[in-house]
Amino acid sequence: EPVFLDFKKDMSQLTAKSDIPVLYKQNVANDLFQLIYVFDMGNNNDKALGTAFDYLEYLGTSDMTPEELKSEFYRLACTFYVSPGNERTYVVLSGLNENMPAAMQLFEKLLADAQVNKEAYENLVEDILKARTDAKLNQGKNFSRLMNYAMYGPQSPATNVLTEAELISMNPQELVDRIHNQNNYKHRILYYGPSSSKDLLATIDQYHQVPAVLKDIPAGNEY
């Protein structure tokens, strides 16, 4: 039967640079790790945030193409993804623990140095608009929208999205700026992996690119 973590009892509470709280649990079963940055902000705080991190998947840096980045993550046996919800955003890096420092350095480089790709943005907008058109023909999604309306009224998390006009007119640099700025906001880190707490904090302090003082989370819409 599954065992659920009690964060206060089962995880050590550490502190990294910039007073970032770190919840630590050592993995004694294998050589894999998962490192998660948790931000208590999401689409309710900035309706463009989800689109920005959808865009990240297609971006390179000033000296690496998207294909080169993917190839390097593959070589390191590590993966990443960013999952922005309405109220919380999870930035997740995972893979082979011995390569975590190199993977973290690469991932932090991407977050800090992602470069605009106009063609990729145009394709992303096309995909988003097509998905919205398809959703209108999906009875289940229409019912979900109806339930949202009944619960929240005309303004809800489901309606708090970039409009077609906003997507088409947006300069993709605005999305890239959001990616660059994400680590500047207050957040906490969760780690599950083989590293000792001392080694983990040393890795975070060396590679996590954050200012000395983190910014407060911007106010969000309440529904």
Regions found by a protein language model. Give the residues of each.
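His/Glu-based metal-binding/catalytic segments typifying zinc-dependent metallopeptidases
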Residues: 1-4, 17-48, 186, 212-223
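Extended non-catalytic domains of envelope/secretory-pathway proteins
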Residues: 3-17, 168-170
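Short, surface-exposed charged micro-motifs
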Residues: 13, 23, 79-81
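Conserved short beta-strand edge segments in small beta-sheet-based binding/regulatory domains
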Residues: 116-123, 214-217
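An aromatic/glycine/proline-enriched structural segment found at the starts
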Residues: 160, 185-223
